[in-house]
């Protein structure tokens, strides 16, 4: 009996995986199914399932492949995918490694267009206030391909309409995977410069794939963030891109964009000529009207007889002067009458007896005051003589007149022999004069 061979789980799984990988029909398969268990992982691989009414298969889409998907996959969306079938040893299940995906029934680009359109509309990018296009620009920036017909059409149109404006080309890719970033970068660059008035972005017609860079979110965000007004001219008139919806103004063609960005110089000159003519006519009319007013004034009675202008005022002054003089006389007469009345009342109310009594009282008071003053002066004189006698008795001169003297040395009074030295010069002061002396001896009396 043959002995059974037991395989490990890994060995069996690897064997089955090799079968999957060796099958040429599984190297490239195309599936239609409904997305299930999808949760968007930012900047990472995507894991989900595809199912129909009867079956379900796990799917993985690596980050590099998912970056090429133009729309946003959603739960329950029916899609068409392509990829290879293989087995994942970790759980022993087979799965499809998806390398491309597009919506079933609707183009992937159209689906992406509608999704981004809804997203930006909800954010308010389409309804935001549009910047006005400068009427008389000095410098216009153009973002387009340097080799396309767009730049030639714009230059031709602007040269014909408004040759004094300066056009500056900012070359950008307008087709391909790098075009959107190229366009957005140039818009941002222009906004760092201070001397531009308007931006024109555009390219010629083409398929939706050709025009797709102008449907990218990065371009829409750059246009919305622009501090300068943006005119979009992408494709033909029937083509409407996301850039057209966000831009401040949309033009059907590059020529139309140039016309929207510039006035016609000849029209401006004609308008200036009209304004000049209107100004001249208006000035002449004003001058004529003022001349007629001057003539009318010259013919008026004020200029013919200027004294009539102030005759009424002179008459009023005379009348007012007479009224003032009359009023002054009246006030003086009234004042004199009032004075006489008051004087009569005063005379009538002053009895002679009261006046006489008052005079006697005043005279009596005067005599009493004189007597008091005389008595006080006599007392003060006696007191003064007594004080003088006392002071005279105590006066040094009075004492010196009785034979006493006082000694000074260097104008200082000598009070003791201790203040003197041999040969000191001293002065003897008498009541009627002085004498000088020199100390020869000093005798001290013992106490």
UniProtKB/Swiss-Prot annotation:
It catalyses: Exonucleolytic cleavage in either 5'- to 3'- or 3'- to 5'-direction to yield nucleoside 5'-phosphates. Its EC number is 3.1.11.6. This is Exodeoxyribonuclease 7 large subunit. It holds the Pfam family tRNA_anti_2. The keyword Ligase does not apply. It is an enzyme of class 3 (hydrolase). Keywords: Cytoplasm, Exonuclease, Hydrolase, Nuclease. Belongs to the XseA family. It comes from Pediococcus pentosaceus (strain ATCC 25745 / CCUG 21536 / LMG 10740 / 183-1w). One of its GO terms (cellular component) is exodeoxyribonuclease VII complex. Bidirectionally degrades single-stranded DNA into large acid-insoluble oligonucleotides, which are then degraded further into small acid-soluble oligonucleotides. The lineage of its organism: Bacteria, Bacillati, Bacillota, Bacilli, Lactobacillales. It comes from the Bacteria.
């Amino acid at each position: 009996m043959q002995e059974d061979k037991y395989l490990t789980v890994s060995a069996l799984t690897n064997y089955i995986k090799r079968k999957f990988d060796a099958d040429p029909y599984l190297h490239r398969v195309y599936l239609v199914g409904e997305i299930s268990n999808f949760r968007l992982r930012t900047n990472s691989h995507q894991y989900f399932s595809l199912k129909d009414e009867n079956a379900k298969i796990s799917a993985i889409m690596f980050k590099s492949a998912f970056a090429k998907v133009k729309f946003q996959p959603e739960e329950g969306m029916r899609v068409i995918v392509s990829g290879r079938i293989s087995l994942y040893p970790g759980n022993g299940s087979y799965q499809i490694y998806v390398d491309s995906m597009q919506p079933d029934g609707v183009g992937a680009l159209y689906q992406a267009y509608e999704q981004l359109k809804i997203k930006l509309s909800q954010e308010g990018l389409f309804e935001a206030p549009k910047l006005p296009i400068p009427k008389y620009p000095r410098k216009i920036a153009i973002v387009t391909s340097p080799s396309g017909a767009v730049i030639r059409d714009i230059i031709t149109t602007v040269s014909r309409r408004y040759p004094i404006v300066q056009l500056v080309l900012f070359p950008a890719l307008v087709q391909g995977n790098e075009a959107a970033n190229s366009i957005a970068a140039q818009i941002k660059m222009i906004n760092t410069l201070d001397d531009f008035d308007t931006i024109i972005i555009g390219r010629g017609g083409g398929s939706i794939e050709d025009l797709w860079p102008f449907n990218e979110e990065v371009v829409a965000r750059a246009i919305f963030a622009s501090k300068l007004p943006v005119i979009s001219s992408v494709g033909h008139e029937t083509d409407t891109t996301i850039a057209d919806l966000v831009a401040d103004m949309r033009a059907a063609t590059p020529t139309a964009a140039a016309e929207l960005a510039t006035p016609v110089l000849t029209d401006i000159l004609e308008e200036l000529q009209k304004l000049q003519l209107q100004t001249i006519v208006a000035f002449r009319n004003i001058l004529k009207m003022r001349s007629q007013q001057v003539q009318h004034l010259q013919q008026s009675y004020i200029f013919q007889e200027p004294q009539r202008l102030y005759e009424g005022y002179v008459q009023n002054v005379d009348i007012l002067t007479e009224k003032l003089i009359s009023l002054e006389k009246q006030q003086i007469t009234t004042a004199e009458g009032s004075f006489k009345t008051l004087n009569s009342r005063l005379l009538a109310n002053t009895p002679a007896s009261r006046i006489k009594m008052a005079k006697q009282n005043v005279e009596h008071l005067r005599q009493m005051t004189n007597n008091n003053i005389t008595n006080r002066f006599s007392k003060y004189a006696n007191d003064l003589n007594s004080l003088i006698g006392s002071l005279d008795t105590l006066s040094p001169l009075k004492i010196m007149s009785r034979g006493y003297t006082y000694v000074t040395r260097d104008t200082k009074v000598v009070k003791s022999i201790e203040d003197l030295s041999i040969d000191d010069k001293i002065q003897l002061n008498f009541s009627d004069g002085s004498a000088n002396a020199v100390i020869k001896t000093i005798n001290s009396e013992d106490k």
